[in-house]
């Protein structure tokens, strides 16, 4: 639905910190499904952990936040979409983060986020991350869209 080229028009993140490759579902102001292909070539695996590579939980949470940012931007009204290049999403809080299953090179990490609450420029999202339908991580995220 939204490829990495389009994602880069929405988010300011770039390699090695752009953590979503594609959006496969998006219902504005409701939910998003996006994924990242985790590869052994990721710079993070040089130190986490040599000989036993595990994708860090903090990177999973950041990927969720980036997917949430795409959802928030794509949920903006048409008149606000025109000024998207002058906006940025700031992470406000993470609550209830839990890491349930390790993510390894070769995994397709799928982010599923649902809007719990939205008021003005503030978004509260329930995020879950899966590999092959196995829950790997979950958290409640709060973010806001602001001018750059």
UniProtKB/Swiss-Prot annotation:
One of its GO terms (biological process) is lipid A biosynthetic process. Keywords: Cytoplasm, Lipid A biosynthesis, Lipid biosynthesis, Lipid metabolism, Lyase. It is found in: Cytoplasm. GO terms for cellular component: cytoplasm; membrane. The active site is at residue 48. Coiled coil: none annotated. Belongs to the thioester dehydratase family. FabZ subfamily. Its EC number is 4.2.1.59. Pfam families: FabA. The keyword Lyase applies. Its main location: cytoplasm. The keyword Lyase applies. This is 3-hydroxyacyl-[acyl-carrier-protein] dehydratase FabZ. GO terms for molecular function: (3R)-hydroxyacyl-[acyl-carrier-protein] dehydratase activity. It comes from the Bacteria. It catalyses: a (3R)-hydroxyacyl-[ACP] = a (2E)-enoyl-[ACP] + H2O. Involved in unsaturated fatty acids biosynthesis. Catalyzes the dehydration of short chain beta-hydroxyacyl-ACPs and long chain saturated and unsaturated beta-hydroxyacyl-ACPs. SUPFAM superfamilies: Thioesterase/thiol ester dehydrase-isomerase (SSF54637).
């Amino acid at each position: 639905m939204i490829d990495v080229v389009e994602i880069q028009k929405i988010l300011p993140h770039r390699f090695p910190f752009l953590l979503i490759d594609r959006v496969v579902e998006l219902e504005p102001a409701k939910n998003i499904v996006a994924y990242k292909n985790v590869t052994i070539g990721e710079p993070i695996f040089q130190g986490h952990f040599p000989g036993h590579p595990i994708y860090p939980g903090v990177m999973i949470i950041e990927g969720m936040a980036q997917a949430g940012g795409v959802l928030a931007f794509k949920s903006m009204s048409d008149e606000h979409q025109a000024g998207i290049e002058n906006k940025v999403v700031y992470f406000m809080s993470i609550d209830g983060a839990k890491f349930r299953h390790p993510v390894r090179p070769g995994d397709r990490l799928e982010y599923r986020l649902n809007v719990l609450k939205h008021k003005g420029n503030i978004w509260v999202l329930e995020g879950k991350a899966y590999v092959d339908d196995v829950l790997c991580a979950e958290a409640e995220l709060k973010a806001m869209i602001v001018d750059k």
